[in-house]
């Protein structure tokens, strides 16, 4: 059958040639004609064999030598190794426009990256997150962190914090969009191999739903471009990254807000949120729930000069107390709630060679001012570890901060975090009511840039704080830290690029500990530690 097909194909292929050369063929002898036919048949058979072999290669796996080879472990090697197809640079997509064939091809080329982005946008789902994890050991037993909020994070961090966010677009038509967002955060213990949530004797393993809200665009006629949200969510946080605390933070149980509302030269963020607190009595054994509400208002992205923007912010927290709650405060020894506020401004300057610096000035009173006076973590909370207590008498505190990074030439980069703060007549969680304090903390992190993927440097941290209580007794807390590190990176920025893998050696020393009485293992005032840490966001 195959032979008959070959002959038939040969005749069909030669027919046009024979017809076009009829006049020439009439002058040839019979022998010459047979010779031409045999030559044409051989060429046709050769061509058909070529196509047949190519078809076989498509469906037959490539084989290796018939003798079975073994690998280093003595196992037989795979006689049919998988061939890896080269990743295409682009894909062809069909145009949906009806007149595409009139204007050109109905197909167009799209890079694989753009095609992947298109598919993600079409699905409308995104999964974002952050976590850190690592190993460390110290000279006196288990390594301990101390004063991260003053001495810096590198080589002083042994937690496994995570944030995981799920976002799904549920509507996007006619200029209106609706997204559902859920975020979980918490910590996974880095000390024991088991990390069950709820098995939390060491206080390490915990998780919460920190966000669960709906955000929209296009529903407000006066602000169609703004993000209007409702649910469990707070105003955006602003972090001093090297110290791991926030200059702007409004926690929320639930709320309603508007972000990126264009007004004049800048944008407005406004949020009204609920944040109930547990109000304790003076024994710190009994508590009652108090309903509080916060208004957080920010006017941001105000242009000043080239690559410089300004933000002005204000926050006010007020209680909505019941009669029984007020009675407990008046007659049963519960601490009185005092409304608290914070306002300030920040300036961000970006640099031509990359990098930035952010300067902020903040003033607060009552319980927020009390948190300005914390040397370890100094986020502007209204409580201390979730508990509201203390005799707040309207005292105020001031905070000045600087953070950022700058490139020096082609091979050096320096990051910084510097904070100066002071307060008068505040409630201190260490020295009580009517306390004054003054604090300075400074962390610098210079590094040599080997290439895009490698940096070697040192993080130097120092802080000192003095509190004076109502009787004018003075209490001092101070210390320093030196961390040598090498990092594997994906970009040269210290503060804005992740993932990052760090190898470090740290020496940390407590010079004075009159506020907290802290010691490392074996009652030592210093610690030498080595370790490795991975930090990633996506």
Swiss-Prot record:
<dbReference type="GO" id="GO:0006811">
    <property type="term" value="P:monoatomic ion transport"/>
</dbReference>
<comment type="function">
    <text>May be a sugar porin with a broad carbohydrate specificity.</text>
</comment>
<dbReference type="InterPro" id="IPR003192">
    <property type="entry name" value="Porin_LamB"/>
</dbReference>
<dbReference type="InterPro" id="IPR050286">
    <property type="entry name" value="G_neg_Bact_CarbUptk_Porin"/>
</dbReference>
<keyword id="KW-0732">Signal</keyword>
<dbReference type="GO" id="GO:0015774">
    <property type="term" value="P:polysaccharide transport"/>
</dbReference>
<keyword id="KW-0998">Cell outer membrane</keyword>
<comment type="similarity">
    <text>Belongs to the porin LamB (TC 1.B.3) family.</text>
</comment>
<dbReference type="InterPro" id="IPR036998">
    <property type="entry name" value="Porin_LamB_sf"/>
</dbReference>
<keyword id="KW-1134">Transmembrane beta strand</keyword>
<dbReference type="Pfam" id="PF11471">
    <property type="entry name" value="Sugarporin_N"/>
</dbReference>
<protein>
    <recommendedName>
        <fullName>Putative outer membrane porin BglH</fullName>
    </recommendedName>
</protein>
<dbReference type="GO" id="GO:0015144">
    <property type="term" value="F:carbohydrate transmembrane transporter activity"/>
</dbReference>
<keyword id="KW-0812">Transmembrane</keyword>
<dbReference type="GO" id="GO:0046930">
    <property type="term" value="C:pore complex"/>
</dbReference>
<dbReference type="Pfam" id="PF02264">
    <property type="entry name" value="LamB"/>
</dbReference>
<dbReference type="GO" id="GO:0015288">
    <property type="term" value="F:porin activity"/>
</dbReference>
<keyword id="KW-0406">Ion transport</keyword>
<keyword id="KW-0626">Porin</keyword>
<dbReference type="InterPro" id="IPR021570">
    <property type="entry name" value="LamB-type_porin_N_dom"/>
</dbReference>
<feature type="signal peptide">
    <location>
        <begin position="1"/>
        <end position="25"/>
    </location>
</feature>
<keyword id="KW-0472">Membrane</keyword>
<keyword id="KW-0813">Transport</keyword>
<dbReference type="GO" id="GO:0009279">
    <property type="term" value="C:cell outer membrane"/>
</dbReference>
């Amino acid at each position: 059958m195959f032979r008959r097909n070959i002959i038939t194909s040969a005749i069909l292929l030669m027919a046009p040639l024979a017809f076009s050369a009829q006049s020439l063929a009439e002058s040839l002898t019979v022998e010459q004609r047979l010779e031409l036919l045999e030559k044409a048949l051989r060429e046709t058979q050769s061509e058909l064999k070529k196509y047949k072999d190519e078809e076989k290669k498509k469906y037959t796996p490539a084989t290796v030598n018939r003798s079975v080879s073994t690998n280093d472990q003595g196992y037989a090697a795979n006689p049919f190794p998988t061939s890896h197809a080269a990743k295409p640079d682009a894909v062809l997509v069909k145009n949906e426009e009806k007149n595409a064939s009139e204007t050109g091809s109905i197909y167009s080329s799209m890079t694989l990256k753009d095609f992947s982005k298109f598919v993600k946008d079409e699905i409308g789902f995104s999964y974002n997150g952050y976590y850190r994890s690592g190993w460390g050991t110290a000279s006196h037993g288990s390594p301990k962190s101390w004063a991260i909020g003053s001495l810096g994070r590198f080589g002083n961090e042994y937690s496994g914090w995570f944030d995981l966010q799920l976002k799904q677009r549920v509507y996007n038509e006619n200029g209106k969009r609706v997204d559902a967002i859920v975020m979980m955060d918490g910590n996974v213990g880095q000390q024991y191999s088991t990390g069950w949530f709820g098995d939390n004797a060491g206080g390490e393993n915990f998780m919460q739903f920190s966000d669960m809200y709906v955000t929209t665009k296009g529903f407000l006629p006066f602000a169609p471009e703004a993000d209007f949200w409702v649910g469990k969510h707070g105003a955006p946080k602003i972090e001093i990254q090297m110290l791991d605390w926030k200059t702007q933070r409004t926690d929320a149980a639930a709320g309603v807000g508007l972000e990126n509302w264009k007004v004049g030269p800048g944008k407005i963020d406004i949020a009204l949120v609920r944040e109930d607190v547990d109000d304790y009595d003076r024994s710190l054994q009994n508590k009652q729930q108090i309903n509080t509400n916060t208004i957080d208002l920010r006017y941001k992205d105000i242009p000043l000069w080239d690559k410089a923007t300004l933000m002005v912010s204000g926050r006010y927290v007020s209680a909505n107390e019941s009669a029984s709650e007020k009675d407990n405060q008046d007659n049963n020894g519960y601490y009185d709630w005092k409304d608290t506020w914070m306002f300030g401004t920040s300036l961000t300057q970006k640099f031509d060679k990359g990098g930035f610096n952010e300067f902020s000035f903040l003033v607060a009173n009552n319980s927020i001012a009390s948190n300005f006076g914390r040397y370890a973590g100094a986020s502007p909370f209204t409580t201390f570890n979730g508990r509201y207590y203390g005799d707040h008498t309207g005292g105020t505190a001031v905070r000045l901060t600087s953070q950022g990074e700058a490139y020096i030439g082609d091979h050096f980069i320096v990051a910084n975090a510097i904070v100066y703060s002071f307060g008068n007549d505040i409630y201190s969680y260490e020295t009580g009511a009517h306390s004054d304090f003054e604090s300075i903390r400074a962390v610098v992190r210079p590094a040599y840039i080997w290439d895009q993927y490698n940096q070697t440097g040192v993080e130097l941290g120092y802080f000192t704080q003095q509190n004076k209580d109502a009787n004018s007794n003075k209490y001092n807390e101070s210390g320093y830290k030196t961390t040598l590190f090498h990092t594997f990176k994906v970009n040269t920025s210290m503060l804005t690029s992740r993932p990052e893998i760090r190898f470090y050696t740290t020496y940390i020393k407590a010079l004075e500990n009159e506020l907290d009485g802290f010691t490392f293992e074996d009652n030592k005032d210093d610690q030498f530690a080595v370790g490795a840490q991975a930090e990633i966001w996506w």
